[in-house]
């Protein structure tokens, strides 16, 4: 598993995980190939590549190709992160989850719930700087695709406790 900071940086962009998984599968790729394979717009792909370069996980291949057709390769620091992304993407496909079904905070949330069940306030504290609205929407989407379960404690007032379902534990196992 990668560190919490790397996981947050990785999930900051919707396409960073699929992009790194593709780069790991192909051992590098050209811009045009990534555009076609992932079906992204040029601006989204350029922004995603810039974010990966800023993280130090990706570089332009200095000894290849024409400047207008750049190729990108993983750095040594990017290889373990890309391997992590491959595992997540493989498990996502097994679970038949579309990219839109895993919102930005879903992977950090699964990593947190892998340790133990938690209340909303504990999740919010662990996932800072998440907003209450973002956490609520993420939990709602994760409940809809059966990755997270919600149980109510028998107290007054009732307290919601969130935990992983079997599908959620399978995805968490791919993240370890």
Question: Residue locations for each model-derived region?
Answer:
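Histidine- and aromatic-rich ligand-binding microenvironments
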Residues: 66, 90-98, 152-156, 176
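A short, conserved structural fragment
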Residues: 53-63, 143-153
């Amino acid at each position: 598993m990668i560190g919490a900071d790397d996981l947050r940086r990785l999930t900051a962009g919707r396409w960073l995980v699929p992009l790194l998984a593709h780069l790991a599968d192909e051992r590098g790729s050209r811009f045009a190939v990534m555009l076609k394979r992932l079906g992204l717009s040029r601006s989204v792909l350029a922004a995603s590549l810039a974010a990966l370069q800023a993280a130090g996980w990706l570089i332009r291949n200095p000894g290849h190709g024409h400047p207008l057709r750049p190729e990108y390769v993983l750095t040594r620091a990017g290889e373990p992160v890309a391997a992590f992304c491959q595992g997540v993407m493989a498990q996502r496909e097994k679970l038949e989850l579309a990219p839109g079904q895993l919102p930005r905070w879903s992977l950090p949330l699964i990593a947190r719930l892998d340790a133990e069940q938690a209340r909303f306030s504990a999740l919010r504290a662990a996932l800072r700087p998440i907003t209450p609205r973002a956490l609520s929407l993420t939990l709602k989407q994760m409940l809809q695709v059966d990755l997270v379960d919600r149980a109510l404690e028998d107290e007054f007032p009732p307290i919601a406790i969130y935990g992983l379902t079997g599908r959620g534990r399978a995805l968490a196992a791919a993240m370890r």
